[in-house]
A protein has these predicted regions:
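Membrane-interfacial helix-loop connectors
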Residues: 1-22, 26-35, 47, 110-147, ...
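Alpha-helical transmembrane segments of multi-pass membrane proteins, especially transporters
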Residues: 8-17, 61-69, 94, 106, ...
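Alpha-helical transmembrane segments of polytopic integral membrane proteins
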Residues: 16, 20, 42, 68, ...
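A structural-propensity feature for long, helix-poor, extended segments
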Residues: 27, 31-63, 164-172, 176-189, ...
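Hydrophobic core segments of alpha-helical transmembrane domains in multi-pass membrane transport
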Residues: 40-50, 64-75, 105-110, 178-184, ...
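Helix-loop-helix hairpins and the membrane-proximal interhelical loops
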Residues: 62-108, 126
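Transmembrane alpha-helical segments and their short flanking loops
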Residues: 72, 83-95, 158-213
Length: 213
């Protein structure tokens, strides 16, 4: 809206941020959230107790990443008791048989969380508890991709310029077409992703990366 970038440049940034989000998911699959407090402590020490600007900048980066991963760790931990509620667990498991419904659930939850990586971190937690089947993975990932664009669309509505609106809606349209194109092909797509790793959390991260490219 500040007319600093053209529409093409803005779309490039949005598509690049999607790839960056997929890298965050890859790090979560590596269980880096277990080291979130270490990152926070290291970043805080570098920022508070050093005078060199480069070290302070590195401290800010580590602190930022640590807080992001700790937030995802807290959200994921909050989902852990779900397996103790049979009705809720059964509803989640049943979504494997209803790919379009799984797509919509992922879209809505991601829009609420305002983060596709955050939703997929929760999905990995549920997968670790055996509540997410392999064939629900692709619909969830596609829904998360589309849901992640909702924040940009809503934010653009309050901006005066047309370029920001066009960029946000173009990003939404691209992800919508991507979802509608691959959702009917979720079974062969799942078969392809299953080859990438024996671990379901890693498969989710790989699917997120593939559909972000």
């Amino acid at each position: 809206s500040a007319k600093v970038m053209t529409l093409a440049q803005a779309l490039g940034v949005l598509l690049g941020s999607a790839i960056g989000s997929s890298l965050t998911t890859q790090l979560i699959a590596f269980k880096i959230t277990d080291f979130a407090l270490v990152l926070i402590f290291s970043g805080a020490c570098l920022f508070l107790f050093t005078k060199r600007s480069r070290r302070r900048s590195l401290g800010q980066i580590l602190l930022g990443f640590g807080l992001i991963f700790y937030g995802m760790f807290v959200m994921s931990s909050a989902m852990a008791p779900i397996k103790d509620y049979p009705l809720v667990a059964a509803m989640i498991i049943s979504l494997e048989n209803y790919p379009f419904l799984a797509f919509l659930v992922a879209l809505i939850v991601t829009a609420i969380l305002q983060s596709s990586a955050g939703f997929l971190a929760l999905l990995m937690t549920l997968a670790g508890q055996g509540l997410v089947g392999s064939y629900a993975m692709i619909p969830f990932v596609l829904g998360a991709h589309l849901g992640g664009t909702i924040t940009g669309v809503l934010s653009s509505l309050g901006t005066p310029g047309r370029e920001s609106k066009r960029a946000a809606w173009a990003n939404f349209g691209f992800k919508l077409i991507n979802g509608l194109l691959f959702l009917p092909l979720y079974r062969p797509s799942t078969t392809f992703v299953l080859w990438s790793s024996p671990d379901l959390s890693r498969q989710i991260a790989n699917a997120h990366t593939i559909f972000s490219l």
